[in-house]
Every structure is written in C-alpha cells, then in structure tokens.
Amino acid sequence: GVIELPMADVAGGGIVTGSALMGKKPIYIIRYQGYNWLNCTFIVNYACKSNEIWKIPCPLIIRGIASEGSIGPVAGSAHISVIYKMPGLKIFSPMSSKEYIAVYNKFIKSKDVFYISEHRHSYSNKKEFKNEIKGKKDLILMPISVTRFEAEKAKKILEKKGFKVGIIHLVNLK
C-alpha cells in the first residue's frame, strides 16, 4: 500500500528505515535531490550501514528526483555525491523504462539500499539507449543522468566532423 508522509524532510528517512528493518522493502521518494542532506540522515547513517556492518538487512529504494534548471541550483540539481561514499548503498541513474525495470528487478533480489537518481526529463523518454564501443574510437563519451540525452546529440555532431565516437551510457553508478 501507499503511505503518505508529512512534508517533514528529516522524519521520512527515519520512518522508511524502520519500515525496511521490519522487512517491508519500502520505496521512498525525495522530491528534490538537494534535500538529500535532510532526507538521507537516517538512511545513510543506519539503513546503509545496517547490512554492511551489523549483517541486519534494511532494503529500501530511494527515488531522488532531479530537474536541472527549473527550480534553482540548490534543490533541483543532481546531488548524488553527498551520499556516494556511504557503505551499503547502490546508486543507479536509469533514463529509460527498461533500465528502470532492470534496476527494480535487481532490488527485489537484494538486501541493499538502492538510490535511484531520477531526472524529470526522463519521464517522457520513449527511447532506449545503446552503448557503442566496437572498433577503434577517437573518443568515448560516458554520460550519466540527463546528460545522456545531450551526449547522443554531441556524438552525432562529432561524427559529422570526422571523429569516431563511442558512447557508454552509465546506469549503475555504484
């Protein structure tokens, strides 16, 4: 079922951590990644470390939403570096529905905390991305998140200028 939490950015992480400890595998949505500082306090200091240090699984998904440029640099940008070094945390940045389903299927089989860095621009995306690394390349692009859309455009521009360009779309970030 769905439980609507109050807009208290600190309390939600604690509630979700407790739910995960009870075996519920919750999905927690952070409305802006800039609020990772507040929302992830309990998650990174207990849920992520729980299985890693104490062998007590605390599986949950965090959906961190990013939206570069529309609401300012503090709240809307992608802020995954804030929590990147936490033990027991897996970070993904799917930009297509198939990538998202693959990440979710990994989570179902896992005991870890998954942070899914989403971008609002990906919600309307119908395209699937393909890595292109065969053959000799002059350069290889390795974009993440929303930059993957622009990297596809940059690849075409560079190829028109005579460069042999490969691209690796990074989804599994940690």
PLM region descriptions:
Residues 101-113, 119-160:
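Glycine-/acidic-rich phosphate or pyrophosphate-binding loops and their flanking alpha/beta elements
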Residues 1-113, 117, 122-124:
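Thiamine diphosphate
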Residues 25, 167-168:
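Short helix-loop-beta-strand segments that form the rim/entrance of peptidase-like active sites
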